Amino acid sequence: MKNLILIPLFTVAAINPVCAQKAPAHIRLTEQSMMHESRVTPSPLNGAMVDDRFVSFQWPLPAEAQSDGAPMDGFEHLVKKIDKSKLAYKIRYAQDSTFRKGCFQADTRWPFYNPEKPLSLGTWYWQYAYVKDGQPQWSETLQVEVKDNGHRFCPPSLKEVLACVPLSHPRVWIIKDEWDKFRKESLGKVERAWYLERADKVLITPMKDVKDINTSQVKNLTNQMQINSYLTRESRRIIDAEEGNTEALIRAYLLTKDRKYADEAIRRVMIMSDWNKNANVKGDFNDATLLSLCSMAYDSFYDLLTSAQKKELLDDIREKGNGMYNHFNNYMENHIAENHIWQMTLRILTMAAFATYGDLPEADTWTDYCYNVWLARFPGLNKDGGWHNGDSYFTVNTRTLIEVPYYYTKLTGFDFFSDPWYTNNVMYTIFQQPPFSKSGGNGSSHQNVMRPNSIRIGYLDALARLTGNTYAADFVRRTLKSDSLYLKKALLAKPGDLAWFRLQCDKPLPDGPGLTALPWGYVFPETGLASFQTNWDRVGSNAMWSFRSSPYGSTSHALANQNAFNTFFGGKPIFYSSGHHIEFTDVHSMLCHRGTRAHNTILVNGMGQRIGVEGYGWIPRYYVGEKIGYVLGDASNAYGKVISPLWLKRGEQSDVHYTPENGWDDVPLTKFRRHIVNLGNTGYIFIYDELEASEPADYTFMLHTVTQPMSVDKTDKRYIHVQGLSGRGGASDAYIFSTGALQTDTTSQFFVPAHNWLRADDKGNFKKYPNHYHFTAKSEKAKVYRFGTIINTHAVKYPAKAPEILEDGRIKAGGWLISVNLKAEGAPSFFIRSTKDKVSITYKGQETIVDENGYVTTMRDKVPELEI
């Protein structure tokens, strides 16, 4: 039997009919967005209940300090200047609503506050205040109920952490008192040999120079965005290479205490320390890299450095660290997710802060901020463990997600990985990309993630050891059985090398239930993701589908793919999101990769979904069972003109025009709900689309493939048959039924060609991007329209059998009988039952009811718990 314990089913069992009548079946959201680029609500929300972790108080910035930040790297000069030294806040909290008894009050310079001790159980009242001209302007009184679910995450206070920081150096990558023991225990580990092998090569490799940055293509670029992006990439090519080389030398010294590694590393760091002053060095990642090298050299070589070298390094650390702190504070703690800070730069400032704590006065502030903002906002954006930026950019956060909490754990002895987010994140990491399989197809650059890379496997390896998760352990074992040196591929990878962690952590991979004990599907309602499988044991026989309808919309690295699905067989994509991520706001990337026309969803009057948090969807209902699964996505509010100030600025700076000609305009859409029913582990899914508008509109159903063209068969007038192929023995056959006649088209051309002006190899050769394949089925104009689609994903060697339409109008497919209302009249509805097992699903325009083995689950809409 599949393990269903871990699946958080947001459903309501039909036990109490009185209570059931009180909850509306449908919730129609009217908010312009579910999330915000910058916080607009306090946390915890008024009336909230917190039972899984300590309470961190957070609130919006004052209006005069609110900012979306720089639209992109290189445009920081466009951000309004804020004198952060004038920002001040107060907070008070008590179990007395009048704040007269037992009131705790504090001053803070940031818009959040973590109590030094976890709040006791019960009802608490709290207020925050903006301090202006010395006078506090108090908020309304807010209330929070504190409970304990038995696994409450309550980490130590900053005061307790700082008491554990050693006075000696090194203290970050290794603690001096543990150094000799660490060196001895590393002798039998392969990671030690890897680092020494790389370091020995570096010793005989000439160092690159900042003058080697290639600027030859600048003359061919058309706007400042392209110039900044190109120089950022080319300067990172030099600086990242030298970071890897120098980091290998530092780690080799820590492993051996051999001066040859230290002397060469010190020489290189002293040369690189001011490379940020070169006009061709662009981007905050380069600044952070240089801070990392300076601070790790200072800490690791402390006993070898001269007084002059220490002073020079401390001066560099002060300059770069202050620049980062001044950017972060009173900004990132309120921001939905400042990409680069979350990915790497907060980690780097954190390590620099602890490396220089006690040696630099500024480090007192940095440690305070870095530790407390971690407690308040990190490690994840929400509780469900999903990552809204998608499959490719998730791995850029790897070192941050492991190294920062592992350092705090080593310092204090408190298990920072007991944060429940990590348990949920294992499920995201597994379900969105099973072993040896293509990624789920979400987020910028997902096209490049052909199988779980070595960084992702290293991350699962770390979480398996740290949390005892046996599913992650099985995933890792299966991968390393195929390639025992697979983890070496991540050695010194900037965002994701965890070889040093494995040298430090002696916990073994745990034994226990493996992937075959997992359920067929998993849903992340806060992130807005779902995926289902048919075979955890043999990827070659696995039919998978993924789905997204997300409150995060299409901001950051997320895509405008609300209510979109992808299909896979044998780990290869079939019906799959199209387009190429050339650059964050490149015209092709925006119109043909981020934009809605690139995805397996719906266009309304030819228009796509908004760019930004305003183009959102959500998952009101879902069910994961042994014999049936179900997800309902709602993208009713996703469409319209782009109105995000941040994305309008980005478009302006990148020559991206949000016009009707390019696919953005107001539309009369009032409802777009997509139901997907997973028909057991047969490889069949049923999709039912409810579309309504305030005036007649046309609706375009889209499918895309990225490896081979689709075939379209309209022989049977009752449906359109579209077949997509993986090119590796897999197929998805889609049978599209609809309210009326459809006008179809196929093309192998992008709306805007994929022109690579950015990504050249070391020899200056620019990679060519292939075209993809696109199918559209456009309806006549109507106020109400419905699509019903059956998709069978299978091995090509076992050809699909067309659905059988019975005399009474029911459809028979894959051992299931389907009744569906495709007419514009009457309530939207479907009824599906298995011909083999006692399982069915019913929808008649209100509740969704699943009957599985005699247990009835009635689902009504539930809004996911969100903040920001």
Locate each region found by the language model.
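Pro/Thr/Ser/Gly-rich low-complexity, intrinsically disordered linker/stalk tracts
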Residues: A23-F75
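Low-complexity, Pro/Ser/Thr- and charge-rich linker/hinge segments at domain boundaries
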Residues: H26, V144-I174, V712-D713
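Recognizes extended acidic, P/S/T-rich segments that occur
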Residues: G69, D73-L121
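Extracellular fibronectin type III
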Residues: D133-N149
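Aromatic-lined, polymer-binding surfaces characteristic
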Residues: Y195, I227-K438, S445
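Carbohydrate-active enzyme catalytic cores, enriched for enzymes
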Residues: T356, V396-I574, E780-R786, P803-I868
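CBM-like, beta-strand-rich accessory domains located in the C-terminal region of large
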Residues: H581-I868
